[in-house]
Amino acid sequence: MDTSKDLICIGFEGTAEKTGVGIITSKGEVLFNKTIIYTPPVQGIHPREAADHHAETFVKLLKEALTVVPIEKIDLVSFSLGPGLGPSLRVTATTARALSLSINKPIIGVNHCISHVEIGKLKTDAVDPLTLYVSGGNTQVLAYTGKKYRVIGETLDIAIGNCLDQFARHCNMPHPGGVYVEKYAKDGNKFMKLPYTVKGMDISLSGLLTAAMKKYDSKERIEDVCYSLQETSFSMLTEITERALAHTNKAEVMLVGGVAANNRLKEMLDVMCSEQNVDFYVPEREFCGDNGAMIAWLGILQYLNGKRMDLADTKPISNYRSDMVEVNWIHEENNNSENGNIKSRIIPEHLIGKGAEADISKGRYLEFESITKERVKKGYRTSELDELIRMRRTVKEARFLAAIKELGIYAPSIFDIDKENKKIAMSYIHGKIAKEKIEEGSIDFCEDLGKIIGKMHVGGIVHNDLTTSNFIVSDNTFVIDFGLGKYSDLVEDKAIDLIVLKKSIMSIHYDKFDRVWNKIVEGYKTYNLAESVLECMKEVEKRARYL
């Protein structure tokens, strides 16, 4: 095929209950894009019924598409290889193979999740965004680094779309339920406290879902329950996006996926991005949910940059994670640069640091060098939830910074706590954060990080936000930022603590990951229960369902 001419690709999307066919050119012009959603006769989606829906509707959509673009003009066939429901993926792959063989054109299977990101970039001005991808089956925070889209944060159990749909079914709302939850939430005026579970850059939604169902069953107004569910879950999503933003220092945030159509979620992220001085993007509604155009576009990107597939390579992959894809179409020299410099988040000059939760300023407390950590109000959260979170985390951090010293772990000294304004004044530590040391090539000290984590776990303390930004290395190694910390002797909680750290290292220290992680594990093994925690880590990682 002559790749110098404008290619036309047809894309088939069928990972769950939506059947999509799209046609796009290599210049990014969408010639056809239509999706038909399967609405189950009873609650819930049966995989076989969804697959039958694809078998019927692909034929209809293909016929319609070929009235817009004649079949002889198709140069490439693309389809969603995964992740998704097995029966749906098989029907989609079979449809694509049949067309490819009948017109003798090449075929490309693509990752569904990354397709959302790339169509979002095509349809907005985003170049190198931190992406929040939210849908019925997926909840991920993604960032491109080191030839891959890294999963920096994700749900530890159910996806946000699934959470909203399950709640809607429980309340006898039609499918898809998220639309009706949003509608009811607009008329809610009473915020009810529900579980708010953030672990580093990951979230858990199952407890929130159960609690919301119980509120509904207890005869609370459905408008108020929907309002509280939406405010709580979307605040969690916005927070982990903000945490990932502080960790990666990206200059852009993009929202994609079916749940991206929710106006309240878009509003929250827009406010957060304004507070963090970064750009926010969301594609038009047509390209938020599952669609064939996004599949066709990623197929073109991969094909033009050398990707080729034989029919034997087109077997669907139901657990096809975003970080399994080798990205061949992004070239570093063109990736979000201004005059050759990579764009990054801008921190205000009066601060020495700006995290996801707090502004950090340097000063003096009596005769001592100090920093003040202020948990600032978050404009995206309701005032009730914001006050609760900031107060709880301010007090918790002060308590844990004192507690870990009793375990022989170095931490800043607390000078003063201003609970009313959510401020902590503490000693200034001369040193570099571990993130900077690793970027400079220093690795050996990472064994100390493992030992520190082991000591915390011996003392029953789980940090819940372990990243290389939360250790300061000087003559000794200090651990900071305990706002998400808790006491727990559960092996799984300790395993998740390590998983949070492991994912944060992979996201920005990918080229040094093995050396850094091995050093940390070596140090952690000084903890007498280390082996059981490390084994549990493997089990928890295997459970990652929403890919």
Curated annotation (Swiss-Prot):
Amino-acid positions noted as binding ATP in the UniProt annotation, renumbered to this chain: 352-360, 373
According to its UniProt record, which cofactors does this protein need? Answer: Fe(2+)
| Region (Kae1), start-end ranges | 1-329
InterPro entries, from UniProt?
Answer: ATPase_NBD, Bud32, Gcp-like_dom, KAE1/TsaD, Kae1_archaea_euk, Kinase-like_dom_sf, RIO_dom, tRNA_threonyl_synthase/kinase
List the PANTHER family hit by this protein, alphabetically: TRNA N6-ADENOSINE THREONYLCARBAMOYLTRANSFERASE
Q: How does it assemble?
A: Component of the KEOPS complex that consists of Kae1, Bud32, Cgi121 and Pcc1; the whole complex dimerizes.
What is the protein name stated in its UniProt record?
Probable bifunctional tRNA threonylcarbamoyladenosine biosynthesis protein
